[in-house]
A protein has these predicted regions:
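Alpha-helical transmembrane segments in multi-pass integral membrane proteins
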Residues: 14, 50-54, 84-88, 119-216, ...
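Membrane-interface helix-loop-helix regions
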Residues: 4-73, 103-119, 126, 190-204
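Generic hydrophobic alpha-helical membrane-span motif
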Residues: 6, 18, 79-80, 149
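Small-polar-interrupted transmembrane alpha-helices in polytopic inner-membrane proteins
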Residues: 94-111, 162-167
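Function-critical hydrophobic alpha-helical transmembrane segments in multi-pass membrane proteins
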Residues: 60-85, 132, 136-138
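Hydrophobic alpha-helical segments of integral membrane proteins
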Residues: 38-42, 75, 79, 83, ...
Length: 225
């Protein structure tokens, strides 16, 4: 994915310059800071909020390619996997996954970020970095646990079940209510911790009549999409 990161950073820098090299409040940014931001993005060095190379002024880790924050945490997850997580037994991994699930649920339900949702991790400001780690570590550990213990079950129409379930879950609007607990946080925690892992299990258990050769023939198109 890193070639795409570089491409996105270059396009971000070009777009920022075409827009006049200004932040949201109209402050002009020196070209040297834009080039420094580009270099940091290419080498995946996150920007500190308020730093000169945090050119957009929103506190983003990667102002020239905002979505890179997600891949940044995935890189951290892979490093942790290589150093520690892959050594864990199934029982230890299950305990870790449960603890991370409880931590993530608490973060969302008690609205630790103050956002009313799990939309954290895009900045190093405040609780965002810790929240971003939780957002990455729980699904990462849960995915490993599912992979190690996966046993397909017989389910007819797995594709349609999963598709309808996802459309239904994604159709739910933001849920108001922040006291005593965050209603929207409860819903998002349910989706991430319970619903999505179950859907992954069901989807992996499904069968298809499409051949592997047919899928390979359309691989390039799928990547572009």
């Amino acid at each position: 994915l890193h070639p795409m990161v570089i491409m996105g950073a270059v396009l971000g820098a070009i777009t920022f310059c075409l827009q006049g090299c200004v932040q949201w409040d109209g402050t002009h940014i020196a070209l040297s800071m834009i080039m420094l931001s580009l270099l940091c993005t290419i080498f995946f060095i996150p920007a500190m909020p308020g730093a000169g190379y945090e050119v957009r002024g929103n506190g983003e880790m990667f102002p020239l390619n905002g979505p890179c924050w997600s891949l940044f945490f995935e890189y951290l997850g892979n490093i942790l996997y290589a150093l520690f997580i892959h050594r864990l037994s199934n029982k230890a991994l299950a305990v870790l996954t449960i603890l991370l699930g409880v931590a993530l649920a608490s973060f969302a339900i008690f609205d630790i970020s103050g956002y009313g949702n799990m939309g954290v991790g895009w900045t190093l400001d405040g609780i965002n970095f810790g929240g971003g780690l939780l957002r990455m570590l729980f699904p990462f550990s849960m995915g490993m646990l599912l992979s190690r213990n996966f046993k397909p079950i017989k389910v007819k129409g797995a594709f349609w079940i999963c598709a309808i379930a996802l459309v239904t879950l994604f159709s739910v609007p933001y849920l108001e209510g922040a006291t005593p607990v965050c209603t929207n946080g409860i819903y998002e925690a349910f989706c991430v911790i319970i619903a999505f892992p179950v859907l992954v299990w069901l989807g992996a258990s499904g069968t298809t009549t499409v051949s592997y050769t047919h899928l390979r023939a359309h691989e390039t198109t799928l990547h572009l999409v």
